[in-house]
């Protein structure tokens, strides 16, 4: 982790990855690739994937909205593509002041 101007910037590594929301939604969804990353984390020390954050960004886009069904659908799809991979979901809500 790097701290710049009082902001923590997570560096992608063997324990942490950021993925665009496009990786798990719409025609660009690539669940086999996401499942592969989950298996890699499970085979190591575990890890964290934050969805909805674009490469080079530290927060999701301000206008981004996530369908409330998406997290459960994601877990079900990953479970269907893997064996013995435990997924723990957590959610974060980011609020900004646009004024």
Task: Describe the function of each predicted region.
Residues 1-99:
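Conserved N-terminal catalytic/coupling substructures associated with nucleotide/phosphate chemistry
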């Amino acid at each position: 982790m790097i701290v710049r101007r009082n902001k923590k910037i997570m560096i992608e590594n063997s324990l942490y990855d950021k993925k665009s929301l496009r990786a798990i939604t719409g025609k660009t969804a690539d669940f086999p690739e996401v499942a592969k990353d989950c298996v890699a984390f499970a085979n190591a020390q575990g890890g964290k994937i934050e969805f909805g954050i674009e490469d080079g960004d530290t927060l999701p886009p301000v206008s981004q909205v996530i369908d409330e069904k998406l997290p459960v659908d994601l877990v079900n799809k990953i479970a269907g593509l893997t064996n013995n991979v435990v997924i723990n979901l957590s959610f974060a809500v980011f609020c900004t002041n646009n004024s």
